[in-house]
Amino acid sequence: MTPRKLALALIACASTLTACDDPNLLQAQLATVADTYDVFALTGTPASFPSGINTYIRSTVRVDGNANFDVAFDIDDSGKVIVYPVQKVVSSLTSSRRVGLRRVDGAFASVTIAPSGTYADSSIVALPGEVIVLQSMRNGASDACQFDISPYIYTKLTIDSLSLVSRAIRVQTVLDPNCGFRSFESGIPSR
């Protein structure tokens, strides 16, 4: 490339970058979404019943070896809900499909941002009303964050209610579908 073409390319690139307020600032494109799901315990219910949630596609799913879920749910002998990240249920996962869980203090409505720091890859025993934040890695082939700077999607959830007779669990969630963004406030996140 000649020096003149190189100079023109650099000027064009600089003009493009300075056309925005801050070329380093990523902007979210999608609004956060609140959902309510009814799932069933992994044990004591038919295998055809949905026991998991795929937070990104916003759907309850059957829990099987396909690992098409972020978290699965069960009810222990004392009547408490156990929340399992996908890698605790399906062992043959790729490294690009991990989910971390973190218990967060406060009421569900008051948790407006996913905390930074460590998310454990272990199960959590949850009581109704407790808040859990999921950090779901979505950077596999043809996945949502495949080409983004951050591979993580964040969701907060709480156990709304459960029935020990039917082994049904009602779960409330708020999903921030923007890769790397942590906001649970309604609308398009700014952080």
Task: State where each predicted segment sits.
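Sec-dependent bacterial lipoprotein signal peptides
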Residues: 1-20
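Surface-exposed, beta-sheet-biased, low-hydrophobicity segments with strongly acidic/polar composition
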Residues: 20-191
